[in-house]
Amino acid sequence: MTRSFPDRLPTNLAFPGISVINQSSFVDLLRRQAPELLPVSLGGGQSGGGQQLSHGTTIVVLKYPGGVVIAGDRRSTQGNMIAGRDVRKVYITDDYTATGIAGIAAVAVEFARLYAVELEHYEKLEGVPLTFAGKVNRLAIMVRSNLTAAMQGLLALPLLAGYDIHAPDPQSAGRIVSFDAAGGWNIEEEGYQSVGSGSIFAKSSIKKLYSQVSDADSALRVAIEALYDAADDDSATGGPDLVRGIYPTAVTIGAEGAAEVTESRIAELAREIIESRSRAYTLGSFGGSEK
């Protein structure tokens, strides 16, 4: 009788002792078969550091009853220069997850796209999607693979937002997972998180406004307002640009799946926030002049 050992790597029967390729992992398969096709940060080549590369920030994530919303600003910087004003930093990666990645812009984009392919590749081969815990582990492995490049300046840190379809309570099925540069991860229990150069200002804003969150729309408003506050204090974070018509991007994820928020809705919320802040500043200035 042959016993199975689930914790042991599968072996090639033709060559005992030689591990087979983990074909359910697209990144692992590509690394073994065609490493030159991988992004530089994941082992596809050598890099000389990230001093002259553009950086993207800031990402915010909030849970609401029945789901989660993730949003990001659009600015990328190169040193003290603005490198781009319409960079996309939030991506839907499968039916129930989305990622927002801050750091080196090129690495962040490749991370998000490769992660989406990784999840799709697994589902096609295995016939079932990964559990949420499995999705977290796959992204953690990718982040850990980038550690050497991160130490050379090519750092990109993701935030994973998702809806756990296996959660016992659908109202609390929204999930937020943060990662460190070594691939360590943490499920956020506070209900919100932020990453990027403006994260400290965004989190401070969310902390004061989070009690207003009751549904997806109110969570979206708080997320946009947090990015507005971050842009007010952090030069690397871009706020809503009414002149150019450039606004943050956002994704909501609930029981019905992940969906991008329309630009028109974000623009409407941005105008409301700016108008309310303008009235507050105007009233404050008049009040301060009285004696």
Swiss-Prot record:
Residues the record marks as active site: T57 (nucleophile)
Record carries keyword GTP-binding: no
CC annotations in GO: cytoplasm; proteasome core complex, beta-subunit complex
InterPro entries for this protein: Ntn_hydrolases_N, Proteasome_sua/b, Proteasome_suB-type, PSB_actinobac
Protein's pathway: Protein degradation; proteasomal Pup-dependent pathway
UniProt keyword terms in alphabetical order: Autocatalytic cleavage, Cytoplasm, Hydrolase, Protease, Proteasome, Threonine protease, Zymogen
SUPFAM superfamilies hit by this protein: N-terminal nucleophile aminohydrolases (Ntn hydrolases)
Catalytic activities: Cleavage of peptide bonds with very broad specificity
Pfam family name, one: Proteasome
E.C. numbers: 3.4.25.1
Intracellular or extracellular location(s): Cytoplasm
Propeptide: 1-56
Gene Ontology biological-process annotations: modification-dependent protein catabolic process; proteasomal protein catabolic process
One function term, GO molecular function aspect: threonine-type endopeptidase activity
Activity regulation summary: The formation of the proteasomal ATPase ARC-20S proteasome complex, likely via the docking of the C-termini of ARC into the intersubunit pockets in the alpha-rings, may trigger opening of the gate for substrate entry. Interconversion between the open-gate and close-gate conformations leads to a dynamic regulation of the 20S proteasome proteolysis activity.
Task of the protein: Component of the proteasome core, a large protease complex with broad specificity involved in protein degradation.
Subunit description: The 20S proteasome core is composed of 14 alpha and 14 beta subunits that assemble into four stacked heptameric rings, resulting in a barrel-shaped structure. The two inner rings, each composed of seven catalytic beta subunits, are sandwiched by two outer rings, each composed of seven alpha subunits. The catalytic chamber with the active sites is on the inside of the barrel. Has a gated structure, the ends of the cylinder being occluded by the N-termini of the alpha-subunits. Is capped by the proteasome-associated ATPase, ARC.
Family listed: Belongs to the peptidase T1B family.
Record HAMAP family: Proteasome_B_B
Protein name as it appears in the record: Proteasome subunit beta
Organism of derivation: Mycobacterium leprae (strain TN)
